[in-house]
Amino acid sequence: MSYKIEADEIDIHPSVKIGKNVKIKCKSIKLGEFCIIGDNVTIECNKFEAHSWLFMWHGVEVGRGGCNGKNSNVKIGKGVGIFENTVINPSESVEIGDNCGIGADVMIWTHGAWLDVMQGVPHDFGPVKLGNNVWLPARSIVLPNVTIGDNVVIGTNSIINRDLPDGCLAAGTPCKVIREGLYPRPLNDKDLKKLVEHICSDWIDLCISKGITRNIEVWYEKRKIFLNQNSLQTIYYLDDRKIEGHTNDVSEDLRDYLRRRGIKIYTDRFFKSI
């Protein structure tokens, strides 16, 4: 075993994958099915709970500064991605909703104090909450006492020091709302067909570069993607987010490529490309 867990309560699903040199020190740790913890990850807080399909990549650090108190709790929803070298500081609670993407080198802070507060300098302590479907891209910083609503897209290198409403596009230093009520805005069938056909065309080109020589056909019809390999068919249901039919390394490669392009279909298997 190349990782170390110190906890009074441990609830880790058998499917979870944990990388090398991982250090976890919590009173309570819970990891749901198909979570992946990359190499050189540190998690130190009171309680850490992640739903299924967490992707926490190399060098992520959960901790720093007063993370042993009763409020030092981290709760993460389903299908969240947290990428390289991100820092999450849970001096106070941090809650991250379903399907959030947190880019590389992001920092989330729940405390900020250094100089003598008796001299009137700024200081701040408070929880951070991200709603569902939030995209917090690379090198952004979230400061204490911030709540970000559902379906929010934020620009790279932003400093978020105030609450952001549902459905907005926001960016800047400090972060400002550019447009409200922008998301979600579901594509009609015509636009979805155009998007999916473009994605599938790119995937076919990638298959050629990977040396996949099987006879492959892929097309879109009525909010479904059809994949034929010789006489074997796989159907990807975009509304229900499920798969029916034949599955093998090629069908899984397409599922993983769809994930990379923003169409996530979860099954009882990890995403895997050829």
Question: Over which residues does each language-model region extend?
Answer:
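Flexible, glycine/small-residue-enriched loop-and-beta-strand segment within the central core
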Residues: D11, K17-V146, T173-P174, E180-L182
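Contiguous mid-protein beta-loop-alpha structural module that forms a pocket-lining wall or clamp
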Residues: I160-G167, P174-I178
